[in-house]
Amino acid sequence: MAPVVVTGASSLQGAVSGSEEPSQRGDKAHHKEGGGFVNPWPSFKDPGRGPGTLWQAYKSWETHPVPPADLLPSYRTPTFAPPASLSAQDKDEWYADLKATWLGHACFLVEFPAPQSAPGGAERRGYRVLFDPVWSHRCSPSQYIGPQRVTKPPISIDELPAVDAVVISHNHYDHLDITTLRHIYQAQPKGSVHFFAPLGNKAWFRSAIGVDEGEVTELDWWDERELRLGAAKEGGRDDEGERLRVVCTPCQHFTGRGLMDRNDTLWASWSISSSAGGKVWFGGDTGYRTVPRGRESALAGLPVCPAFAEIGRREGPHDLGMIPIGAYDPRWLFSSVHCAPEDSVELHREVRCRKSIGMHWATWQLTPEEMTEPPKRLRAACEQYGIGADEFGVTDFGATVRIKVERR
């Protein structure tokens, strides 16, 4: 597959297939009458945003010092191309693998297996999908106030290779960053990158990023689209080319970028697979159950979100899961929308992930738990099920994880 460079025959033309309107199948209980969206399950209870809630949150907030660098993830140089020292056979194996690089917080660059050969001497690679990219220093409406990075991205945004799709889970500032998205869009040839987001976000991409109508797709839960590189051949579609299947899947969260737009847009997780092989699930930002005060150590019997088991039934198994493990304390306030590591393990099992990487930690201090706590709790939770660190663990910034997958 050639690099995503616009030429007469390799631009993204008509590449997103499917009806223009969100599909009508499935339960639409998450659609709020009159507009907006809700979490439709007993597993979600809103703690509220009134003065009493804010006061209780303030009283329970414990400030921890930023850990020294040697206790946080190390920095690695990403492997976006096979090392020159590899033998021809080893290079073939590298191209055949699914590859995921953690770029901090919830940002991953995933490269699916490459085809057996590239036409015309073009770069040989698989589809590249970038999830929730944020390079800004603050995750805030302003770069003068709001949470500052504790750790920097492992590469500059200029070192990011060309990507075919950018997939967004929801519109919170630590997942949807206007400066980053503008840079990506402007750095690549026109029409060479497609943006996917949940319902209600298309207008923002059109106005804030300046994308054309055909360069962004918004989807409802369980809607899916197919992405192809290259224009359709004369007389019909080129069914021989590589294809990327993008499925918008549910999760339990909320949205808003200001004071008056709470839940006006949808939140989502994503299941994405390539016709060349490999399937991943990106959890975005999600809760699993609401934990009342005093029940932090007594989770049995609490309602859990049924969406993840449904994802596993409909879309599993997944070769890789990218699952949030941080920003969870205090539980009475954040449990309905942010997984603690004990919840993350349940997602790994229910979504049916062969391997998972923990994310949504060690980048910004968004909640009061000590920053190095999430991977420790994750390891303890995994051990309860006999899940080893090679199956579900954390990785270093910039580390490229290779996963063997079944070629198609």
Listing of model-derived features with the role each one plays in the protein:
Residues V110, D132, H170, D177, ...:
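Divalent metal-coordination and catalytic microenvironments
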Residues M1-K32, V38-F44, T151-L160, D164-A165, ...:
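Cap/insert and terminal regions of metallo-dependent hydrolase folds
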Residues E111, P119-A122, R228-G316, S335-E342:
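Catalytic core of the metallo-beta-lactamase
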Residues M1-E159, V163-D174, P189, A197-G284, D319, R379-E406, ...:
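Metallo-beta-lactamase
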Residues P133-W135, N171, G200, C251-Q252, ...:
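Active-site metal-binding loops of divalent metal-dependent hydrolases
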